[in-house]
Amino acid sequence: MAQKKGGGSTRNGRDSESKRLGVKVFGGEHINAGSIIIRQRGTRVHPGANVGIGKDHTLFALIDGQVEFGVKGALKKAQVSVLPRS
């Protein structure tokens, strides 16, 4: 007779790869044109001045400058802008 029970199989053991979302450059930091500021799902943060938006809602800098976070409109939506160096 067997001294141990059979091992059997498990139905667990799978997980998806992390998507590395989030803020990549914070307020007050210098950024170069084309650099990613935020990777996000949907427009949690909206693009402001000198910020572009990709087809996956990634926000990126259009110019070299300093990153600034704020709110816009009556609904107080989060927004990120890039201010040119003066």
Swiss-Prot record:
<keyword id="KW-0687">Ribonucleoprotein</keyword>
<dbReference type="Pfam" id="PF01016">
    <property type="entry name" value="Ribosomal_L27"/>
</dbReference>
<feature type="region of interest" description="Disordered">
    <location>
        <begin position="1"/>
        <end position="22"/>
    </location>
</feature>
<protein>
    <recommendedName>
        <fullName>Large ribosomal subunit protein bL27</fullName>
    </recommendedName>
</protein>
<dbReference type="GO" id="GO:0022625">
    <property type="term" value="C:cytosolic large ribosomal subunit"/>
</dbReference>
<dbReference type="GO" id="GO:0003735">
    <property type="term" value="F:structural constituent of ribosome"/>
</dbReference>
<dbReference type="GO" id="GO:0006412">
    <property type="term" value="P:translation"/>
</dbReference>
<dbReference type="InterPro" id="IPR001684">
    <property type="entry name" value="Ribosomal_bL27"/>
</dbReference>
<feature type="compositionally biased region" description="Gly residues">
    <location>
        <begin position="1"/>
        <end position="10"/>
    </location>
</feature>
<comment type="similarity">
    <text>Belongs to the bacterial ribosomal protein bL27 family.</text>
</comment>
<keyword id="KW-0689">Ribosomal protein</keyword>
<dbReference type="InterPro" id="IPR018261">
    <property type="entry name" value="Ribosomal_bL27_CS"/>
</dbReference>
